[in-house]
Protein backbone atom coordinates (compact mmCIF):
# COMPACT_ATOMS: atom_id res chain seq x y z
CA UNK A 1 0.00 0.00 0.00
CA UNK A 2 1.31 3.49 -0.89
CA UNK A 3 2.23 5.88 1.89
CA UNK A 4 -0.61 8.23 2.82
CA UNK A 5 0.48 11.88 3.00
CA UNK A 6 -0.03 13.38 6.44
CA UNK A 7 -3.03 15.72 6.54
CA UNK A 8 -2.63 19.25 7.76
CA UNK A 9 -3.52 22.91 7.37
CA UNK A 10 -2.11 25.96 5.69
CA UNK A 11 -1.66 29.09 7.78
CA UNK A 12 -0.13 32.56 7.46
CA UNK A 13 2.62 33.74 9.80
CA UNK A 14 2.99 37.45 10.57
CA UNK A 15 6.36 39.09 11.37
CA UNK A 16 7.59 38.90 14.98
CA UNK A 17 5.34 40.90 17.25
CA UNK A 18 2.55 40.95 14.66
CA UNK A 19 -0.81 39.24 14.39
CA UNK A 20 -1.36 35.67 15.63
CA UNK A 21 -1.41 32.81 13.09
CA UNK A 22 -4.13 33.06 10.43
CA UNK A 23 -5.40 29.56 9.55
CA UNK A 24 -6.85 29.18 6.06
CA UNK A 25 -10.07 27.24 5.29
CA UNK A 26 -9.26 23.79 3.94
CA UNK A 27 -12.60 23.25 2.19
CA UNK A 28 -12.02 25.58 -0.76
CA UNK A 29 -13.80 28.56 0.78
CA UNK A 30 -12.33 31.98 0.08
CA UNK A 31 -10.86 34.11 2.85
CA UNK A 32 -10.63 37.88 2.34
CA UNK A 33 -7.82 39.71 4.12
CA UNK A 34 -6.88 43.36 4.41
CA UNK A 35 -6.74 46.15 6.95
CA UNK A 36 -8.38 44.98 10.15
CA UNK A 37 -8.07 43.06 13.42
CA UNK A 38 -7.24 39.70 11.82
CA UNK A 39 -4.01 41.03 10.28
CA UNK A 40 -3.55 43.93 12.75
CA UNK A 41 -2.70 46.11 9.74
CA UNK A 42 -3.71 49.78 10.13
CA UNK A 43 -2.08 51.11 6.95
CA UNK A 44 -4.74 53.23 5.17
CA UNK A 45 -3.27 52.26 1.80
CA UNK A 46 -4.33 48.69 2.48
CA UNK A 47 -7.99 48.05 1.66
CA UNK A 48 -10.15 46.21 4.17
CA UNK A 49 -10.73 43.78 1.30
CA UNK A 50 -7.22 43.79 -0.16
CA UNK A 51 -6.85 40.14 -1.25
CA UNK A 52 -8.92 37.00 -1.63
CA UNK A 53 -7.23 33.71 -0.69
CA UNK A 54 -8.25 30.17 -1.61
CA UNK A 55 -6.16 27.40 -0.04
CA UNK A 56 -5.53 23.98 -1.60
CA UNK A 57 -4.21 21.63 1.12
CA UNK A 58 -3.54 18.83 -1.40
CA UNK A 59 -1.00 20.89 -3.35
CA UNK A 60 -0.12 23.05 -0.33
CA UNK A 61 -0.63 26.20 -2.36
CA UNK A 62 -2.83 29.27 -2.06
CA UNK A 63 -4.41 31.20 -4.94
CA UNK A 64 -4.27 34.96 -4.31
CA UNK A 65 -6.51 37.48 -6.08
CA UNK A 66 -5.99 41.21 -5.55
CA UNK A 67 -9.17 43.13 -4.76
CA UNK A 68 -7.73 46.41 -3.47
CA UNK A 69 -6.42 49.33 -5.52
CA UNK A 70 -2.79 49.38 -4.36
CA UNK A 71 -0.52 46.50 -5.39
CA UNK A 72 -0.11 43.29 -3.44
CA UNK A 73 2.85 40.98 -4.01
CA UNK A 74 3.04 37.18 -4.01
CA UNK A 75 6.65 36.16 -3.68
CA UNK A 76 8.27 38.34 -6.34
CA UNK A 77 5.16 38.84 -8.49
CA UNK A 78 3.46 42.22 -8.09
CA UNK A 79 -0.29 41.99 -8.66
CA UNK A 80 -2.86 44.43 -9.96
CA UNK A 81 -6.59 44.67 -9.23
CA UNK A 82 -8.30 41.52 -10.48
CA UNK A 83 -5.07 39.65 -11.21
CA UNK A 84 -4.17 36.39 -9.49
CA UNK A 85 -0.96 34.94 -8.15
CA UNK A 86 -0.07 31.92 -6.06
CA UNK A 87 1.87 31.07 -2.93
CA UNK A 88 3.76 27.93 -2.02
CA UNK A 89 4.85 26.98 1.47
CA UNK A 90 7.55 29.41 2.54
CA UNK A 91 6.46 32.11 0.08
CA UNK A 92 5.51 35.53 1.39
CA UNK A 93 2.45 37.62 0.61
CA UNK A 94 3.03 41.37 0.97
CA UNK A 95 -0.42 42.83 1.51
CA UNK A 96 0.24 46.26 -0.01
CA UNK A 97 3.16 48.22 -1.47
CA UNK A 98 5.72 45.60 -0.46
CA UNK A 99 4.73 45.88 3.20
CA UNK A 100 2.93 43.80 5.86
CA UNK A 101 4.38 40.36 5.01
CA UNK A 102 2.49 37.14 5.68
CA UNK A 103 4.40 33.91 5.09
CA UNK A 104 2.62 30.70 4.12
CA UNK A 105 3.25 27.79 6.49
CA UNK A 106 2.11 24.14 6.61
CA UNK A 107 1.18 22.41 9.82
CA UNK A 108 0.66 18.65 9.86
CA UNK A 109 -2.16 17.12 11.90
CA UNK A 110 -1.74 13.61 13.31
CA UNK A 111 -5.38 12.83 14.09
CA UNK A 112 -7.44 14.51 11.38
CA UNK A 113 -10.52 12.40 12.08
CA UNK A 114 -10.90 14.07 15.46
CA UNK A 115 -10.33 17.53 14.09
CA UNK A 116 -13.35 19.24 12.52
CA UNK A 117 -12.92 22.20 10.23
CA UNK A 118 -12.64 25.38 12.28
CA UNK A 119 -13.10 28.99 11.28
CA UNK A 120 -10.08 30.97 10.04
CA UNK A 121 -8.01 32.24 12.93
CA UNK A 122 -9.03 29.39 15.28
CA UNK A 123 -6.05 27.25 16.41
CA UNK A 124 -6.22 23.45 16.24
CA UNK A 125 -7.41 22.05 19.56
CA UNK A 126 -7.14 18.25 19.65
CA UNK A 127 -5.14 16.91 22.60
CA UNK A 128 -2.56 15.37 20.27
CA UNK A 129 -2.10 18.64 18.42
CA UNK A 130 -2.22 21.35 21.09
CA UNK A 131 1.54 21.49 21.40
CA UNK A 132 2.13 21.76 17.64
CA UNK A 133 -0.65 24.26 17.09
CA UNK A 134 0.77 26.56 19.74
CA UNK A 135 4.34 26.52 18.38
CA UNK A 136 4.07 29.75 16.36
CA UNK A 137 2.60 31.60 19.34
CA UNK A 138 5.15 30.22 21.80
CA UNK A 139 7.98 31.12 19.46
CA UNK A 140 6.87 34.75 19.31
CA UNK A 141 6.40 35.08 23.07
CA UNK A 142 9.75 33.49 23.87
CA UNK A 143 11.67 35.83 21.56
CA UNK A 144 9.95 38.92 22.94
CA UNK A 145 10.22 40.67 19.56
CA UNK A 146 8.95 44.03 18.41
CA UNK A 147 9.74 47.73 18.26
CA UNK A 148 11.11 50.03 20.93
CA UNK A 149 10.65 53.77 20.42
CA UNK A 150 13.34 55.87 22.07
CA UNK A 151 14.14 59.53 21.68
CA UNK A 152 15.86 59.88 18.29
CA UNK A 153 16.27 56.08 18.04
CA UNK A 154 14.05 53.18 16.95
CA UNK A 155 15.03 49.59 17.79
CA UNK A 156 13.49 46.47 16.23
CA UNK A 157 14.24 43.00 17.55
CA UNK A 158 13.10 40.05 15.45
CA UNK A 159 12.16 36.66 16.83
CA UNK A 160 15.18 34.47 17.40
CA UNK A 161 17.65 37.27 18.12
CA UNK A 162 20.09 36.24 20.85
CA UNK A 163 22.83 38.13 22.69
CA UNK A 164 26.22 37.28 21.25
CA UNK A 165 29.83 38.23 21.86
CA UNK A 166 30.47 39.12 18.23
CA UNK A 167 28.41 41.20 15.83
CA UNK A 168 28.07 41.31 12.06
CA UNK A 169 26.76 44.82 11.49
CA UNK A 170 25.33 46.17 8.26
CA UNK A 171 24.05 49.37 6.77
CA UNK A 172 20.65 48.95 5.09
CA UNK A 173 20.19 50.94 1.87
CA UNK A 174 22.87 50.19 -0.71
CA UNK A 175 24.27 47.38 1.43
CA UNK A 176 21.53 44.79 2.00
CA UNK A 177 18.85 46.27 -0.27
CA UNK A 178 18.61 48.61 -3.23
CA UNK A 179 15.71 50.16 -5.13
CA UNK A 180 13.70 47.97 -7.45
CA UNK A 181 13.13 50.99 -9.70
CA UNK A 182 16.84 51.61 -10.17
CA UNK A 183 16.53 55.14 -8.84
CA UNK A 184 18.84 56.54 -6.18
CA UNK A 185 16.05 57.06 -3.65
CA UNK A 186 13.05 54.74 -3.25
CA UNK A 187 9.87 55.92 -4.93
CA UNK A 188 7.72 54.30 -2.25
CA UNK A 189 7.77 51.75 0.58
CA UNK A 190 7.69 48.79 -1.81
CA UNK A 191 10.54 50.06 -4.01
CA UNK A 192 13.23 47.71 -2.73
CA UNK A 193 14.90 44.38 -3.46
CA UNK A 194 17.81 42.40 -2.06
CA UNK A 195 21.03 43.96 -3.42
CA UNK A 196 22.86 40.73 -4.34
CA UNK A 197 21.57 37.13 -4.50
CA UNK A 198 24.59 36.03 -2.44
CA UNK A 199 23.41 37.99 0.60
CA UNK A 200 20.87 35.59 2.21
CA UNK A 201 23.27 32.64 2.07
CA UNK A 202 26.09 34.66 3.62
CA UNK A 203 23.80 35.89 6.38
CA UNK A 204 22.76 32.32 7.21
CA UNK A 205 26.43 31.37 7.45
CA UNK A 206 27.13 34.23 9.83
CA UNK A 207 24.20 33.26 12.03
CA UNK A 208 25.44 29.66 12.12
CA UNK A 209 28.90 30.91 13.14
CA UNK A 210 27.45 32.64 16.20
CA UNK A 211 27.29 36.23 15.00
CA UNK A 212 24.53 38.54 16.10
CA UNK A 213 23.17 40.21 12.95
CA UNK A 214 22.49 43.92 13.39
CA UNK A 215 21.46 46.68 10.99
CA UNK A 216 22.54 50.26 11.77
CA UNK A 217 20.76 52.77 9.54
CA UNK A 218 20.44 56.57 9.42
CA UNK A 219 16.91 57.68 8.51
CA UNK A 220 16.87 61.44 9.02
CA UNK A 221 13.71 61.78 6.90
CA UNK A 222 11.74 60.25 9.79
CA UNK A 223 12.90 62.98 12.16
CA UNK A 224 12.16 65.63 9.56
CA UNK A 225 8.61 64.37 9.11
CA UNK A 226 9.11 63.37 5.47
CA UNK A 227 8.87 59.60 6.09
CA UNK A 228 6.20 58.17 8.42
CA UNK A 229 7.84 56.04 11.08
CA UNK A 230 5.16 53.35 10.81
CA UNK A 231 5.73 53.06 7.07
CA UNK A 232 9.45 52.56 7.56
CA UNK A 233 8.86 50.06 10.37
CA UNK A 234 6.70 47.97 8.06
CA UNK A 235 9.43 48.11 5.41
CA UNK A 236 12.04 46.93 7.91
CA UNK A 237 9.86 44.00 8.94
CA UNK A 238 9.35 43.07 5.28
CA UNK A 239 13.09 43.24 4.57
CA UNK A 240 13.98 41.13 7.61
CA UNK A 241 11.34 38.60 6.62
CA UNK A 242 12.79 38.41 3.12
CA UNK A 243 16.37 38.02 4.35
CA UNK A 244 15.24 35.01 6.35
CA UNK A 245 17.47 35.45 9.41
CA UNK A 246 16.87 37.12 12.78
CA UNK A 247 18.06 40.72 12.81
CA UNK A 248 18.19 43.50 15.34
CA UNK A 249 17.71 46.88 13.66
CA UNK A 250 18.76 50.26 15.06
CA UNK A 251 17.39 53.34 13.30
CA UNK A 252 18.80 56.84 13.93
CA UNK A 253 16.01 59.32 13.20
CA UNK A 254 17.78 62.60 13.99
CA UNK A 255 21.21 64.19 13.90
CA UNK A 256 23.34 63.78 16.99
CA UNK A 257 24.81 60.98 19.04
CA UNK A 258 22.98 58.13 17.28
CA UNK A 259 23.65 59.22 13.70
CA UNK A 260 26.50 57.42 11.97
CA UNK A 261 29.42 57.86 11.96
CA UNK A 262 29.03 58.79 15.65
CA UNK A 263 28.89 55.57 17.64
CA UNK A 264 25.72 56.10 19.68
CA UNK A 265 23.82 53.23 18.05
CA UNK A 266 26.66 50.81 18.79
CA UNK A 267 26.91 52.12 22.34
CA UNK A 268 23.17 51.49 22.80
CA UNK A 269 23.58 47.95 21.44
CA UNK A 270 26.41 47.17 23.85
CA UNK A 271 24.93 48.85 26.91
CA UNK A 272 21.20 48.16 26.58
CA UNK A 273 20.37 45.76 23.74
CA UNK A 274 22.67 42.75 24.15
CA UNK A 275 21.52 41.51 27.56
CA UNK A 276 24.80 42.50 29.18
CA UNK A 277 26.95 40.29 26.95
CA UNK A 278 30.23 42.08 26.10
CA UNK A 279 30.92 42.46 22.38
CA UNK A 280 34.40 41.78 21.02
CA UNK A 281 35.36 44.56 18.60
CA UNK A 282 38.12 42.47 17.03
CA UNK A 283 35.79 39.54 16.34
CA UNK A 284 33.05 41.74 14.88
CA UNK A 285 32.69 43.46 11.50
CA UNK A 286 30.73 46.27 9.89
CA UNK A 287 29.67 46.35 6.24
CA UNK A 288 28.46 49.47 4.47
CA UNK A 289 28.41 51.20 1.10
CA UNK A 290 29.17 54.74 2.35
CA UNK A 291 32.89 54.05 2.14
CA UNK A 292 34.49 57.15 0.61
CA UNK A 293 35.27 55.43 -2.70
CA UNK A 294 36.17 57.84 -5.54
CA UNK A 295 34.58 57.97 -8.98
CA UNK A 296 35.31 54.92 -11.18
CA UNK A 297 36.30 52.85 -8.16
CA UNK A 298 35.49 49.69 -10.13
CA UNK A 299 34.61 48.90 -13.76
CA UNK A 300 31.11 50.16 -14.42
CA UNK A 301 30.96 52.02 -11.09
CA UNK A 302 31.30 55.62 -12.27
CA UNK A 303 29.81 57.45 -9.31
CA UNK A 304 31.80 58.13 -6.21
CA UNK A 305 30.32 57.17 -2.85
CA UNK A 306 27.92 59.80 -1.56
CA UNK A 307 29.53 59.58 1.86
CA UNK A 308 32.19 57.92 3.98
CA UNK A 309 29.94 57.57 7.04
CA UNK A 310 29.93 53.76 7.20
CA UNK A 311 33.71 53.45 6.99
CA UNK A 312 34.10 56.22 9.57
CA UNK A 313 31.57 54.52 11.88
CA UNK A 314 33.78 51.43 11.85
CA UNK A 315 36.91 53.56 12.21
CA UNK A 316 35.48 55.35 15.25
CA UNK A 317 34.86 51.98 16.90
CA UNK A 318 37.98 50.19 15.69
CA UNK A 319 35.81 47.65 13.85
CA UNK A 320 37.03 45.71 10.81
CA UNK A 321 35.24 47.15 7.76
CA UNK A 322 34.22 45.97 4.31
CA UNK A 323 32.03 47.22 1.49
CA UNK A 324 29.12 45.05 0.26
CA UNK A 325 31.10 44.11 -2.84
CA UNK A 326 34.16 43.13 -0.82
CA UNK A 327 32.15 41.19 1.76
CA UNK A 328 29.46 39.45 -0.28
CA UNK A 329 31.08 39.25 -3.74
CA UNK A 330 34.76 38.94 -2.69
CA UNK A 331 35.82 41.86 -4.88
CA UNK A 332 39.28 43.31 -4.20
CA UNK A 333 39.41 46.24 -1.81
CA UNK A 334 38.75 49.59 -3.50
CA UNK A 335 40.58 52.82 -2.80
CA UNK A 336 38.97 55.45 -0.62
CA UNK A 337 39.42 58.96 0.70
CA UNK A 338 38.99 60.05 4.31
CA UNK A 339 37.81 63.56 5.24
CA UNK A 340 40.41 66.33 5.16
CA UNK A 341 39.92 67.01 8.87
CA UNK A 342 40.81 64.23 11.29
CA UNK A 343 39.59 65.02 14.85
CA UNK A 344 42.02 62.46 16.28
CA UNK A 345 44.91 64.77 15.40
CA UNK A 346 43.74 67.76 17.45
CA UNK A 347 46.28 68.57 20.14
CA UNK A 348 45.56 69.39 23.77
CA UNK A 349 48.89 71.17 24.16
CA UNK A 350 51.13 73.56 22.29
CA UNK A 351 51.67 77.31 22.03
CA UNK A 352 48.65 79.49 22.72
CA UNK A 353 49.53 81.85 19.90
CA UNK A 354 51.88 82.25 16.96
CA UNK A 355 54.44 83.64 16.86
CA UNK A 356 55.23 82.34 20.34
CA UNK A 357 57.41 85.34 21.08
CA UNK A 358 54.38 87.64 21.21
CA UNK A 359 52.70 88.34 24.54
CA UNK A 360 49.11 87.14 24.73
CA UNK A 361 47.99 89.82 27.21
CA UNK A 362 48.60 93.54 27.42
CA UNK A 363 49.02 95.45 30.66
CA UNK A 364 47.65 98.61 29.04
CA UNK A 365 44.22 99.38 27.54
CA UNK A 366 43.76 97.89 24.08
CA UNK A 367 41.20 96.32 21.76
CA UNK A 368 41.57 92.69 20.64
CA UNK A 369 39.46 91.79 17.60
CA UNK A 370 38.83 88.06 17.11
CA UNK A 371 38.45 86.66 13.58
CA UNK A 372 37.30 83.13 12.86
CA UNK A 373 34.54 80.73 11.87
CA UNK A 374 31.65 80.05 14.22
CA UNK A 375 32.99 77.12 16.22
CA UNK A 376 36.65 78.07 15.80
CA UNK A 377 37.05 78.31 19.59
CA UNK A 378 36.94 82.10 19.95
CA UNK A 379 34.62 82.37 22.96
CA UNK A 380 36.28 79.55 24.89
CA UNK A 381 39.76 80.96 24.31
CA UNK A 382 38.90 84.60 25.04
CA UNK A 383 37.01 83.78 28.23
CA UNK A 384 39.71 81.41 29.47
CA UNK A 385 42.68 83.70 28.81
CA UNK A 386 41.51 87.32 28.37
CA UNK A 387 38.19 87.82 30.16
CA UNK A 388 39.55 85.97 33.20
CA UNK A 389 42.41 88.51 33.20
CA UNK A 390 40.04 91.48 33.25
CA UNK A 391 39.25 92.16 29.59
CA UNK A 392 35.68 93.31 28.88
CA UNK A 393 33.89 90.68 26.81
CA UNK A 394 31.96 92.12 23.84
CA UNK A 395 29.80 89.60 21.98
CA UNK A 396 27.04 90.22 19.45
CA UNK A 397 25.14 87.06 20.41
CA UNK A 398 24.59 88.47 23.91
CA UNK A 399 24.30 92.17 23.04
CA UNK A 400 22.08 91.70 19.98
CA UNK A 401 23.62 94.06 17.40
CA UNK A 402 26.97 95.38 16.20
CA UNK A 403 25.87 98.89 17.22
CA UNK A 404 25.61 97.78 20.85
CA UNK A 405 28.97 96.06 20.54
CA UNK A 406 30.55 99.32 19.39
CA UNK A 407 28.89 101.28 22.20
CA UNK A 408 30.05 98.77 24.83
CA UNK A 409 33.58 98.90 23.43
CA UNK A 410 33.65 102.71 23.50
CA UNK A 411 32.36 102.80 27.08
CA UNK A 412 34.95 100.30 28.30
CA UNK A 413 37.79 102.20 26.64
CA UNK A 414 36.68 105.47 28.25
CA UNK A 415 36.95 103.65 31.59
CA UNK A 416 40.54 102.67 30.77
CA UNK A 417 39.72 98.99 30.32
CA UNK A 418 40.94 96.35 27.90
CA UNK A 419 38.37 94.96 25.44
CA UNK A 420 37.99 91.61 23.63
CA UNK A 421 35.65 91.64 20.60
CA UNK A 422 34.22 88.11 20.37
CA UNK A 423 32.51 88.11 16.95
CA UNK A 424 33.32 86.35 13.66
CA UNK A 425 34.44 89.62 11.98
CA UNK A 426 35.07 88.01 8.57
CA UNK A 427 35.90 91.10 6.50
CA UNK A 428 37.71 94.41 6.78
CA UNK A 429 34.46 96.36 7.00
CA UNK A 430 33.24 94.49 10.10
CA UNK A 431 36.63 94.89 11.78
CA UNK A 432 37.00 98.59 10.91
CA UNK A 433 34.39 99.59 13.52
CA UNK A 434 36.59 98.39 16.35
CA UNK A 435 39.82 99.63 14.83
CA UNK A 436 38.17 103.06 14.77
CA UNK A 437 37.12 102.71 18.43
CA UNK A 438 40.74 102.00 19.39
CA UNK A 439 42.05 104.84 17.24
CA UNK A 440 39.58 107.31 18.79
CA UNK A 441 40.65 106.22 22.29
CA UNK A 442 44.33 106.37 21.40
CA UNK A 443 44.99 102.71 22.20
CA UNK A 444 46.41 99.88 20.06
CA UNK A 445 44.20 97.31 18.32
CA UNK A 446 45.40 93.74 17.81
CA UNK A 447 43.83 90.97 15.73
CA UNK A 448 43.56 87.38 16.97
CA UNK A 449 43.09 85.16 13.90
CA UNK A 450 41.64 81.78 14.90
CA UNK A 451 43.00 79.35 12.32
CA UNK A 452 40.47 76.49 12.56
CA UNK A 453 39.43 75.43 9.05
CA UNK A 454 35.87 75.21 7.78
CA UNK A 455 35.73 71.44 8.32
CA UNK A 456 37.17 71.69 11.82
CA UNK A 457 34.71 74.44 12.74
CA UNK A 458 31.82 72.35 11.40
CA UNK A 459 33.04 69.42 13.49
CA UNK A 460 33.27 71.66 16.55
CA UNK A 461 29.71 72.88 16.02
CA UNK A 462 28.39 69.32 15.72
CA UNK A 463 30.22 68.44 18.93
CA UNK A 464 28.65 71.42 20.72
CA UNK A 465 25.19 70.39 19.53
CA UNK A 466 25.70 66.89 20.93
CA UNK A 467 27.04 68.02 24.31
CA UNK A 468 25.38 71.36 25.04
CA UNK A 469 21.60 71.53 24.70
CA UNK A 470 21.68 75.29 25.24
CA UNK A 471 23.88 75.81 22.20
CA UNK A 472 22.07 77.26 19.19
CA UNK A 473 22.90 75.16 16.09
CA UNK A 474 24.89 76.89 13.37
CA UNK A 475 23.71 76.00 9.88
CA UNK A 476 26.02 75.13 7.03
CA UNK A 477 24.63 78.16 5.21
CA UNK A 478 26.13 80.38 7.90
CA UNK A 479 29.45 78.51 7.78
CA UNK A 480 29.80 78.69 4.01
CA UNK A 481 28.60 82.29 4.09
CA UNK A 482 31.49 83.15 6.41
CA UNK A 483 33.96 81.46 4.08
CA UNK A 484 32.63 83.40 1.11
CA UNK A 485 32.80 86.70 3.01
CA UNK A 486 36.21 86.10 4.59
CA UNK A 487 39.03 88.56 3.96
CA UNK A 488 42.35 87.79 5.61
CA UNK A 489 43.24 90.53 8.10
CA UNK A 490 46.26 92.73 7.36
CA UNK A 491 48.26 95.32 9.27
CA UNK A 492 47.10 97.87 6.70
CA UNK A 493 43.67 97.80 8.36
CA UNK A 494 45.21 99.52 11.39
CA UNK A 495 46.17 96.56 13.55
CA UNK A 496 49.32 96.87 15.62
CA UNK A 497 49.80 93.09 15.45
CA UNK A 498 48.11 89.96 14.12
CA UNK A 499 48.43 86.78 16.19
CA UNK A 500 47.36 83.35 14.97
CA UNK A 501 45.46 81.24 17.50
CA UNK A 502 45.67 77.46 16.83
CA UNK A 503 42.70 75.41 18.02
CA UNK A 504 43.40 73.43 21.18
CA UNK A 505 41.08 70.83 22.65
CA UNK A 506 39.74 72.20 25.95
CA UNK A 507 37.23 69.51 27.01
CA UNK A 508 37.01 67.30 30.05
CA UNK A 509 38.37 63.78 29.53
CA UNK A 510 34.96 62.09 29.47
CA UNK A 511 34.05 64.11 26.37
CA UNK A 512 37.41 63.67 24.69
CA UNK A 513 36.45 60.31 23.17
CA UNK A 514 33.35 61.82 21.59
CA UNK A 515 35.24 64.83 20.22
CA UNK A 516 37.83 62.59 18.57
CA UNK A 517 35.16 60.68 16.64
CA UNK A 518 34.49 61.54 13.02
CA UNK A 519 31.01 63.04 13.16
CA UNK A 520 30.17 63.41 9.47
CA UNK A 521 31.00 61.37 6.40
Curated annotation (Swiss-Prot):
Its EC number is 3.1.3.32, 2.7.1.78. Its main location: nucleus. Keywords: Acetylation, ATP-binding, Chromosome, Disease variant, DNA damage, DNA repair, Epilepsy, Hydrolase, Intellectual disability, Kinase, Multifunctional enzyme, Neurodegeneration, Nucleotide-binding, Nucleus, Phosphoprotein, Primary microcephaly, Transferase. One of its GO terms (cellular component) is site of double-strand break. Residues 109-143 are annotated as: Disordered. The keyword Nucleotide-binding applies. Pfam families: AAA_33, FHA_2, PNK3P. The modification Phosphoserine is found at residue 114. Residues 146-337 are annotated as: Phosphatase. InterPro entries: FHA_2 (IPR041388), HAD-like_sf (IPR036412), HAD-SF_hydro_IIIA (IPR006549), HAD_sf (IPR023214), P-loop_NTPase (IPR027417), PNK3P (IPR013954), PNKP (IPR006550), Polynucleotide_phosphatase (IPR006551). GO terms for molecular function: ATP binding; ATP-dependent polydeoxyribonucleotide 5'-hydroxyl-kinase activity; damaged DNA binding; double-stranded DNA binding; endonuclease activity; polynucleotide 3'-phosphatase activity; purine nucleotide binding. It is linked to Microcephaly, seizures, and developmental delay: An autosomal recessive neurodevelopmental disorder characterized by infantile-onset seizures, microcephaly, severe intellectual disability and delayed motor milestones with absent speech or only achieving a few words. Most patients also have behavioral problems with hyperactivity. Microcephaly is progressive and without neuronal migration or structural abnormalities, consistent with primary microcephaly. The FHA domain binds threonine-phosphorylated peptides from XRCC1/4, and is responsible for the recruitment of PNKP to the sites of DNA repair. The affinity is ten times greater if peptides are also phosphorylated on the serine preceeding the phosphothreonine. This is Bifunctional polynucleotide phosphatase/kinase. It comes from Homo sapiens (Human).
Amino acid sequence: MGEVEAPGRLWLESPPGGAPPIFLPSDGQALVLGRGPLTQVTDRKCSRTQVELVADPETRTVAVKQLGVNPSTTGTQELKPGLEGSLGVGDTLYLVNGLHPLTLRWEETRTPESQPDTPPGTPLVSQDEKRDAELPKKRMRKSNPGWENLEKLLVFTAAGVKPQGKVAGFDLDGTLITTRSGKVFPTGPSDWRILYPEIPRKLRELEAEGYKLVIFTNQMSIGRGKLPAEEFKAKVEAVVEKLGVPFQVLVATHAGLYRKPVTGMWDHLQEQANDGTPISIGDSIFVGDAAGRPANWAPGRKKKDFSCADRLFALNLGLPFATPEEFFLKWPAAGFELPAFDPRTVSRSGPLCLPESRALLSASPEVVVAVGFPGAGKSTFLKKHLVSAGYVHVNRDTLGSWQRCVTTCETALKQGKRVAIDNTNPDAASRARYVQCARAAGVPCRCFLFTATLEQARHNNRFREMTDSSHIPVSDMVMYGYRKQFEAPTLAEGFSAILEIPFRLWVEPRLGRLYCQFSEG
